[in-house]
Design a protein with these regions (language model features):
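Phosphate-moiety recognition in structured ligand-binding domains
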Residues: 2-8, 128, 250-251, 256-262, ...
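Short, flexible loop segments at the rims of nucleotide/cofactor-binding pockets, characterized by
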Residues: 10-17, 58-62, 87, 176-183, ...
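A short, well-structured juxtamembrane/interface segment
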Residues: 13-31, 179-196
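Short, hydrophobic/amphipathic alpha-helical patches that form generic packing surfaces
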Residues: 153-161, 217, 221, 291-306
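Cofactor-/ligand-binding subdomain signature composed of acidic, glycine-rich
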Residues: 1-29, 144, 149-152, 159-167, ...
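Anionic-ligand anchoring segments at beta-strand to alpha-helix junctions in alpha/beta enzyme folds, i.e.
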Residues: 21-79, 194-245, 299-302
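Glycine-rich phosphate-binding loops that contact phosphosugars or nucleotide phosphates
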Residues: 27-178, 246-283
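Internal, active-site/partner-interface "lid" segment
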Residues: 139, 158-192, 314-348
Length: 349
């Protein structure tokens, strides 16, 4: 995993990057709400930004670009907007950037990693004369079909944006034991024992949600299997029934920080002994706990791909879906046609 993620290079770059302007945007006036959005592999990055903004005393939420672009201009004026995109050229994020710059230019910011000619978001900010395009030139980040290095870089940069004194050097090397696999009765398992899993339940608490959301995307985009992302409370509220009904072909992944130790122990008390568990744990109770969980969950993903013969670099496409056609679905054109969400009852489409 260390070679795949190139952790030493990513952490060195993240520690050397100048995130001063990004920090000022995210930590100044925390009383203003923040709406963060990310396209593709950056969705979990927006989730992490919102989590950190909340931990810093502000109110924040992460939404998809489609949802953001469903909001009215008046709605977009009520909050800071953070648009996350590695390349800055997907139509949805470009559309969101142009709208934000038109109606809320003083509080619309972009956070991209690529500064080349295809970065249309960066061009839009330059044309508008905005200084809130937070691009970090010279970063060397490589992804294939599935984003692997980009989320790690983003998480590291956000950790530094909110905590300039944070030490990321310990993440230069992969943990020796990034996760534990076992049945709920303590019987040790290995990745091959999860080959027949057809669905996962991901349970998270405080720092775990961004990493859980990221792993869900990896599993689905690689064609491995779907996963349901829940916090521990929602699982205990009734969704444990799925585990009870699918012991033969499901597993539970627990994202654990020091805050969830007791909750995890109590949750395990009611699970059947044969329940397959993936325990992804961090000893950190700070922003980099999410980074730690992201790295550890990535290790599980790569190992699961290895035992199932899944090519995450270029996943199989047995249904032969033309990969260009999903990109051609006219989401933004339809949003322009139908207009923003409204409570008015007299509208017809």
């Amino acid at each position: 995993m260390e070679n795949i993620l190139n952790l030493r290079s990513l952490m060195n770059q993240a520690m050397e990057a100048d995130v001063t302007a990004l920090r000022q945007f995210l930590t100044t006036n925390p009383g203003q709400p923040l709406v963060a959005t990310g396209s593709g592999g950056a969705e979990s990055v927006a989730d992490f930004a919102a989590l950190l903004y909340g931990a810093n005393g502000g109110l924040a939420t992460a939404v998809s670009p489609y949802t953001l672009n469903s909001f009215s201009d008046d709605t977009l004026k009520t909050a800071k907007l953070l648009l996350v995109s590695k390349g800055g050229h997907n139509n949805d994020i470009v559309f969101a950037a142009k709208r934000g710059l038109a109606v809320n230019p003083a509080r619309t910011a972009s956070f991209t990693l690529y500064t080349g000619d295809r970065n249309e978001v960066r061009k839009a900010f330059a044309k508008a004369g905005s200084t809130l395009s937070f691009d970090i030139p010279g970063l060397r980040v490589h992804d294939d079909f599935i984003s692997t290095q980009t989320p790690v870089m983003y998480f590291a940069l956000l950790c530094r944006a909110f905590d300039p004194d944070i030490d990321l050097s310990k993440y230069r090397t992969a943990p020796a034991a990034p996760y534990r696999l076992e049945r709920n009765d303590g019987t040790a398992l290995d990745p091959a024992d999860f080959k027949d899993v057809r669905s996962f339940i991901f349970l998270h608490g405080s720092w775990g949600r961004p990493a859980a959301a990221n792993l869900e995307g990896k599993l689905v985009e690689s064609g491995l299997c779907p996963a349901c992302v829940l916090d521990f409370r929602n699982y205990c509220h009734g969704r444990f029934i799925f585990t009870s009904a699918h012991l033969e072909d499901s597993a539970v992944v627990m994202f654990v920080s020091p805050r969830e130790k007791d909750i995890v122990a109590r949750t395990r008390k009611f699970l059947p002994a044969s329940t397959r568990l993936v325990l992804i744990e961090t000893e950190t109770d700070a922003p980099d706990a999410s980074l730690d969980l992201l790295i550890r969950s990535s290790a599980f993903f790569f190992d699961l791909c290895a035992v199932t013969g899944t090519n995450w670099v270029s996943p199989k496409n047995p249904g032969k879906i033309d990969k260009r056609q999903p990109m051609w679905v006219p989401f933004m054109a339809e949003l322009k046609r139908s207009g923003p969400l409204t409570l008015r009852k007299d509208r017809t489409l």
